Amino acid sequence: MPTAHFQHSIRYLNVTNMLIFSIISFLLIYQTNSVVTLSRIDPAGAVDMGFVDVSYNNFTIQSPIHVPDDGTITWCVSKINCKYDYDEVVGVTAAAFDVWSMTGLVFKPTSRCDRAHIRISFKRRYHGDSDFDGEGGLLAHAFLPNQGALSGDIHMDNDETFAFSFNDADYEGDNAPTSYFWTVLHEIGHTLGLQHSSSKQAIMYGFYVKRSFNNGAVTLSTDDMNGINELYHSNEQSTHQSTRHRPHRRPSPDGSCRDERVLRIRRCRRRDRRRRRPKESGELVLCRSVRCHRVHSRRADHLRRQLHMETRSKRTALRRLSIANDDCVGFTTRFRGYIGVRMDGVHRSRHRQRSASVRRNSLPAQCNFRTKRHLSRSLTTTLCTR
């Protein structure tokens, strides 16, 4: 029979374990998934800025949603717990995404909610993350991008009475219903990476505000546009600079080539029976990128001349750089998915082609075997001859 002190110790350990478990659950929900809520009434006369990372004037941004290669962001409305007409909900939701498409982003509905980037569902009270408080108060909440498993989720309070009309007269009076359009329009901004704004004219203002539909001509405010531009369109413009003189050190591909498959041609050697020359080495780096990458011989003293870029069938742009001391030739080349290289109609002999070691298996995956063979032969001939 355990003593009273031992029983008290067991109860103390059980309470401690429950407390630790509760704290861990709280951290898993609220730290890995940054949730931002929308309230009907501003009780303190100020805007709750939520989880603020970076501030720009009135708007605040978190991080952009992961946009796939085709540039299309998919969204889905779940049928579970939806007490409204599903087709009407989807139609109004599509109208809200059309407003955000003014920023240049492309949205597409899908029926696969498990694969959609933005998922809209109806929840009530306790549902595993941030609780709702019933009718009135909190209207919805959304999870910011890149913050955990719930990133991109929009939860609408199912205890609220939402209206789907676009008529301003339907929202007059003290007991007027809540507009589903304005609510989901605000929450979509959170899933795109926008935080609350201090501007009452902005869609991302922290509290629900009755707005005019303007006969269907709903537009985003300048504050909302600035936030999207800062997240998605700030790094679109890039400049290309060409080097006419030999750099002090051998250049390497820039950051846009990090995840691309690279073709490297090495161990290029030119033999001359009349004069003994040391073994020369060169390297050609080719990657799938819109930028050009310069490669030159290690022992090249200076560039003798530089020819104009030639384009064949709009697939390949090739620039040939001749080296003064007859070392291996360097190139600037651009790859657009299919490559065919021609060097001024000059065909070299086979023993010159064999003087380079080419890794044909390391060519980009978009090239077929015929293209790989032609690319290897052409670039080997060009690289290893004068």
From Swiss-Prot:
It holds the Pfam family Peptidase_M10. Residues 1-34 form the signal peptide. Keywords: Glycoprotein, Hydrolase, Metal-binding, Metalloprotease, Protease, Signal, Zinc. The keyword NAD does not apply. Binds 1 zinc ion per subunit. GO terms for biological process: collagen catabolic process; extracellular matrix organization; proteolysis. SMART domains: ZnMc (SM00235). GO terms for molecular function: metalloendopeptidase activity; zinc ion binding. Glycans are attached at N14, N58. The active site is at E187. This is Putative matrix metalloproteinase. Belongs to the peptidase M10A family. Its EC number is 3.4.24.-. It comes from Spodoptera frugiperda ascovirus 1a. Residues 235-258 are annotated as: Disordered. InterPro entries: MetalloPept_cat_dom_sf, Pept_M10_metallopeptidase, Pept_M10A, Peptidase_Metallo. Its cofactor is Zn(2+). Coiled coil: none annotated. Zn(2+) binds at H186, H190, H196.
